[in-house]
From Swiss-Prot:
The modification Phosphoserine is found at S424. It comes from Canis lupus familiaris (Dog). InterPro entries: Endthln_rcpt, ETA_rcpt, GPCR_endothelin_rcpt, GPCR_Rhodpsn, GPCR_Rhodpsn_7TM. The chain crosses the membrane at residues 80-101, 112-131, 159-180, 205-228, 256-277, 306-327, 347-371. This is Endothelin-1 receptor.
């Protein structure tokens, strides 16, 4: 876990190092004075206008009345370093999430309720990594929106924020469902369930995806290609353009809505159900049946710790970005002559927050690898193609979705049957 934390600290420091000294690239009236595409996301930046734009026109010298007195800019090194970070997240996210899905799919005894929710979370992250990250890399290197002068660019402009918001919604709702599932598992501690995904879990997963897509519809509606003029040339960029009263309302409350639903809700849900789970465990410390099932309860507690770790990582990855948005919404005043220092701080926090938030799409498999030794063995066996010969038998321990362990053929049938029975525990 220490290695994992050090890696996160390294990337944060790296991003902070390449930030330039130009705070005013965050204009509240325009996405950026020259380059609309230097940020690591569409919705996850200050590129969204606070007022409804029509056709934007910049002065030929690229300056505006609201700019800070000092000239500022983003260093060119940022593009390439941020591209390396994006490519790393792309590779790790694609390999990690795909491997996680393969592990759960190929091992029949791993197909249980908690694992199904983890697979749903991994699939949502995989979709974002495969589709959205390449667009980010193109924007960073090309300095413009892809296909910005044809209909396919308009399609990407709507698809990009839609998938981005859907992916976050899938993550948030799956974490809530995992917290509820862990409470149910502890509350019904005497129930031993067989192999398979419960019907209620399947319904939850389908509902999570449908709700996530529905909540992301305003993003697809609001984001359009907005034309603007700069130095006598016509350009287009993808940004939020409120054209109706509902979209104007959505744009006004968007930061608070994202902070409340997509950040606070999973934390509150986890706090509530983990508190109930702790009370349940303390109230049932005694009893002969509980003693007999102590191993199963221990395994369930281990899964609860794993889920809690995923929630904590989610909070750490997304908190800086939400904090910068709330501060920008409540504290920053574009008419304040002393705003430049605050804007520099918000800009730094925003860059760090954007990269951390994007990193969350690849970090869950890594977290499972370090938190669970059994999951670590499973990843190693899958990635390194270490298959045991006829002298080894693969079985899965508790159906809590955390492990795979290996048993020798030399074990007697009695022990094998006991191991198979333990595999059915969720």
């Amino acid at each position: 876990m220490e290695t994992f934390c050090l890696k996160v600290t390294f990337w944060v420091a790296l991003v902070g190092y390449v930030i330039g000294d130009h705070p005013e690239s965050y204009s509240t009236n325009l996405s950026t004075p020259v380059d609309f595409t230097t940020f690591h996301g569409t919705e996850l930046s200050f590129l969204v206008t606070t007022h409804r734009p029509t056709n934007l026109a910049l002065p030929s010298n690229g300056s505006m009345h609201s700019y800070c007195p000092q000239q500022t800019k983003i260093t060119s090194a940022f593009k390439y370093i941020n591209t390396v970070i994006s490519c790393t997240i792309f590779i790790v996210g694609m390999v990690g999430n795909a491997t996680l899905l393969r592990i759960i799919y190929q091992n029949k005894c791993m197909r249980n309720g908690p694992n199904a929710l983890i697979a749903s979370l991994a699939l949502g992250d995989l979709i974002y990594v495969v589709i959205d990250l390449p667009i980010n890399v193109f924007k960073l290197l090309a300095g413009r929106w892809p296909f910005d002068h044809n209909d396919f660019g308009v399609f990407l402009c709507k698809l990009f924020p839609f998938l981005q918001k859907s992916s976050v919604g899938i993550t948030v709702l799956n974490l809530c469902a995992l917290s509820v599932d862990r409470y149910r598992a502890v509350a019904s501690w005497s129930r031993v369930q067989g192999i398979g995904i419960p019907l209620i879990t399947a319904i939850e997963i389908v509902s999570i995806w449908i709700l996530s897509f529905i909540l992301a519809i305003p993003e697809a509606i609001g984001f359009v290609m907005v034309p603007f003029e700069y130095k006598g040339e016509q350009h287009k960029t993808c940004m939020l353009n409120a054209t109706s009263k509902f979209m104007e309302f959505y744009q006004d409350v968007k930061d608070w809505w994202l902070f409340g639903f997509y950040f606070c809700m999973p934390l509150v849900c986890t706090a509530i159900f983990y508190t109930l789970m702790t009370c349940e465990m303390l109230n049932r410390r005694n009893g002969s049946l509980r003693i007999a099932l102590s191993e199963h309860l221990k395994q369930r507690r281990e899964v609860a710790k794993t889920v809690f770790c995923l929630v904590v990582i989610f909070a750490l990855c997304w908190f800086p970005l939400h904090l910068s948005r709330i501060l920008k919404k409540t504290v920053y005043d574009e008419m304040d002559k002393n705003r430049c220092e605050l804007l520099s701080f918000l800009r730094l926090m925003d860059y760090i927050g954007i990269n951390l938030a994007t990193m969350n799409s690849c970090i869950n498999p890594i977290a499972l690898y370090f938190v669970s030794k059994k999951f670590k063995n499973c990843f190693q066996s899958c990635l390194c193609c270490c298959c045991y010969q006829s002298k080894s038998l693969m079985t899965s321990v508790p159906m809590n979705g955390t492990s795979i362990q290996w048993k020798n053929h030399e074990q007697n049938n009695h022990n094998t049957e006991r191991s198979s029975h333990k595999d059915s525990i969720n």
